[in-house]
Design a protein with these regions (language model features):
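Charge-biased, low-complexity intrinsically disordered regions
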Residues: 1-244
Length: 244
């Protein structure tokens, strides 16, 4: 499995980094207790943190909006923004709720009741791979995408497309506008076995991207009992080929 990124994307966005996890021969159709437990745990942690800080992850989401703008995308939301918006809506939490006008004033942490935490599991399950991906976005506040690599022969490419960038699997478009507007090509379904996971970030959250990559690699290996491989793209490193 291979991914290549147009060097101009790294020129356009200084400090851009992409953590990679490759997984081979995963069974994404069967019930997976580890994936389900991880999704639930991430939901509970996010709910607890949102009770204490309703503006949780807003700084990171704004940074990703700036990345989209730098990449030429004028409209659209990133995957991590969509996940947080969906989760907040399901919990009935507003990002502006309880935020002090003076940033120097620290709010007294709110206490979450057992009943409130019992409703944490609001983010609906999809399939084991996507449950781990979506849980990872709630946990680390980073942009994570997974692509079905089919028979592993067709490379995944992030190409320059006019003023913006697109994600392509061979001659098919996965994402018309990089990081948003998902298409059908490369979509992860119950039949998916071989995947490339991309965790995208920048200089300011580089450590979170690395932490998310390492944890997702560990979770995928444990949940599916299959071989995984990790990679990293940054600066002049614009290609990665998995050996598994």
């Amino acid at each position: 499995m291979k991914i290549s990124v147009a060097p101009s994307l790294f020129d356009r966005i200084p400090g851009l980094c992409i953590g990679i996890v490759a997984v081979r021969a995963a069974d994404n159709a069967a019930a997976n207790m580890e994936a389900e437990a991880f999704r639930r745990r991430c939901c509970t942690e996010a709910n607890l943190l949102l009770k204490m800080d309703p503006a949780l992850a807003e700084k990171e989401l704004e940074d990703y909006r700036e990345i989209l703008s730098a990449a030429g995308v004028k409209e659209g939301r990133t995957a991590v923004e969509k996940v947080f918006a969906e989760y907040r809506k399901l919990l009935g939490v507003s990002a502006a709720e309880g935020v002090p006008e003076d940033p120097e004033i620290l709010l007294q942490p709110k206490k979450a009741t057992l009943d409130e935490l019992a409703g944490s599991d609001a983010l609906p399950p999809f399939n084991p791979i996507m449950d781990i991906i979506r849980g990872g976005m709630l946990k680390f506040h980073v942009e994570i995408h997974a692509y079905d690599m089919g028979n592993r022969k067709t490379p995944l490419e992030i190409r320059e497309a006019g003023r913006t960038f697109s994600v392509n699997l061979g001659d098919k478009v996965c994402t018309a506008d990089w990081l948003c507007r998902d298409e059908e090509a490369g979509a992860v379904t119950e039949d998916t076995e071989n995947i490339l996971i991309l965790i995208t970030g920048m200089k300011g959250n580089r450590r979170k991207v690395a932490a998310a990559r390492n944890e997702l690699a560990r979770r995928m290996k444990s949940a599916f009992d299959r071989a995984v491989e990790v990679g990293w793209l940054e600066g002049k490193e614009t290609e990665f080929t998995a050996e598994i």
